[in-house]
Amino acid sequence: MTHSTSNNQWQADTYDHKLDFVSKMGGDVLSLLQPQPGERVLDIGCGTADLTAKIAAAGAVTVGIDLSPEMIARGSDKYPHLNLSAQNAYTYRAAQPFDAVFSNAALHWMKDAHAVAVTVASALRDGGRFVAEFGGYRNVAALVSATERTLTAHGYDPQGRNPWYFPTIGQYAAVLEEHGFLVTLAQHFERPTPLHGESGVRDWLDMMADDFFYDVSAEHKAAIYQAVEDQLRPEHYRQGQSIADYRRLRVCAVKQAD
């Protein structure tokens, strides 16, 4: 997904195979979009484009953007008919207005929410809609706390490593309203998310949390991964799978005329 401020390194094939729940769980927010035939829809942080393809299958004319060239290349391989490109969501400007802007599991990678809101507003026609879901307040709090504690125990300062923006409803609604949107729906909810198999936590840390480990030796990283697993196991492991403590923020908004 688009990560305009993160140094996270994306492995597109691994993402598709081991973190495929990201797009699979996007069905609910996609149903809120209700794309119509002929509509122009921009997908911000499209990743490997599974949801972009579903929007296009409804008859919409889609454009998908993501900061990661690896993700775009993987999406283009899977869906060569789609218009996908590597773009920064902070600076992207559309040549033609869109009827809708969509985003799933991406906006929490973009700490400058105001810059993203400017992009969304500039992309939409008046009356156009914005539908998004991403990490909300206290998303993956247990994973983050365990990681930060373990980094500290191994002599690493955890400050400044967290790459994510997890706002409350009020915080994010205020951003959208400041940029000319009328918020029509805002939900914050828990979504406990199973991670694949015995290596689920390690795979998640490898794919999602590079920023925490940019200066950590391979030896320390292996020990930290094991310690994080051990800390999470009592409360976040069921029936052979680790459970990530996801909390999501879902919003719908309409761009108001100036």
What does each of the following model-derived ranges do?
Residues 90-101:
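A short acidic, Gly/Pro-enriched loop at the edge of an enzyme's catalytic core
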Residues 114-129:
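A short glycine-rich, Lys/Arg-flanked "PGG" loop and its adjoining helix->strand segment in the class I
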Residues 42-44, 48-92:
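Class I SAM-dependent methyltransferase SAM/SAH-binding core
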Residues 165-179:
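Short alpha-helix
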Residues 184-239:
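C-terminal helical/coil "lid" or tail adjacent to the Rossmann-like core of SAM-dependent
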Residues 1-39, 50-54, 71-74, 78, 131-154:
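Conserved class I S-adenosyl-L-methionine
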Residues 100-114:
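A short SAM/SAH-binding and catalytic strip from SAM-dependent methyltransferases
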